[in-house]
């Protein structure tokens, strides 16, 4: 936490030998909060929270995260076996203005997405920390001119659900977009955030299992190769991976790929690193 903090503290010190009670209130005004595991900073954090010993309870707080407004509140509790933290988040963000996506992708997006989330953190007194996150939103007001299957008009509902379960070493991120797209991934926490393995399954009704080895598997619907090549030529892959490491073994499967006035059916493309560079097989 960076910046000036105003606080009031009241100590109740019994003279009969009972435990001291510390109560008070803390006021934040345009502070910055650095989140180390994400290498990200909440800016302009403002609001109040009160405490009674180790139990904290905040009022609604406001902040700016990824250049977007954020509403947040939290509470903590000293449980019998663990210190527990609960956080509620919500916002209405414009994906094209987060500063995270490549310029070529930003140009193809417009609109905003309203979302809310809950974070639960368990800090056992005699074991390692665990946490869970659930985010829900709807891309109904987002318009995308990206190639299919990422194209969508504004006004078309596309509910998104994301869940995270993890500890200090790794976490699994899963979820779905609409009724027929599911994804599953495992991330490792170390010097850098590392995607160990992931899978995206289109036209699926259930969560797919993780790949058996490190890598990314993309099971996609029919694709227009020319549109995707044009997007990559505009730099759609630039700046991706700046804050994280990604596997070099990638498998793409599609029932149909059109490219150069040609059409390939039931295609599987595998890209993997070699001593001399990258080997791509189809």
Regions found by a protein language model. Give the residues of each.
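Glycine-centered tight beta-turn/hairpin loop motif at sheet-sheet or coil-to-beta transitions
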Residues: 67, 178-182
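Membrane-proximal interfacial segments on either side of biological membranes
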Residues: 1-173, 186-282
């Amino acid at each position: 936490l960076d910046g000036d903090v105003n606080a009031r503290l009241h100590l109740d010190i019994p003279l009969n030998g009972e435990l001291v009670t510390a109560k008070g209130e803390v006021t934040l005004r345009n502070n910055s909060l650095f989140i180390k595991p994400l290498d990200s900073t909440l800016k302009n954090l403002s609001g109040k929270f009160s405490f009674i010993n180790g139990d904290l309870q905040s009022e609604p707080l406001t902040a700016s995260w990824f250049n977007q407004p954020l509403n947040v509140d939290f509470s903590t509790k000293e449980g019998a076996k663990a210190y527990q933290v609960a956080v509620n988040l919500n916002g209405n963000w414009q994906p094209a203005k987060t500063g995270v996506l490549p310029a070529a992708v930003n140009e193809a997006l417009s609109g905003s997405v309203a979302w809310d989330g809950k974070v639960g953190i368990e800090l056992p007194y005699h074991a390692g920390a665990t946490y869970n996150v659930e985010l829900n939103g709807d891309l109904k007001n987002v318009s995308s001119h990206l190639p299919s299957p990422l194209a969508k008009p504004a006004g078309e509902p596309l509910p998104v659900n994301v869940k995270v379960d993890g500890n200090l070493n790794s976490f699994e991120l899963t979820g779905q977009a609409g009724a027929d797209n599911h994804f599953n991934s495992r991330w490792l926490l170390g010097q850098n955030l590392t995607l160990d393995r992931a899978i995206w399954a289109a036209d699926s009704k259930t969560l797919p299992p993780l790949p058996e080895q490190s890598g990314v598997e993309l099971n996609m619907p029919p694709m227009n190769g020319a549109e995707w090549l044009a997007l990559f030529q505009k730099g759609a892959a630039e700046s991706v991976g700046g804050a994280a490491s990604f596997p070099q073994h990638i498998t793409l499967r599609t029932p149909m790929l059109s490219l150069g006035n040609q059409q390939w059916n039931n295609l599987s493309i595998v890209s993997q690193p070699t001593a001399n560079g990258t080997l791509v097989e189809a």
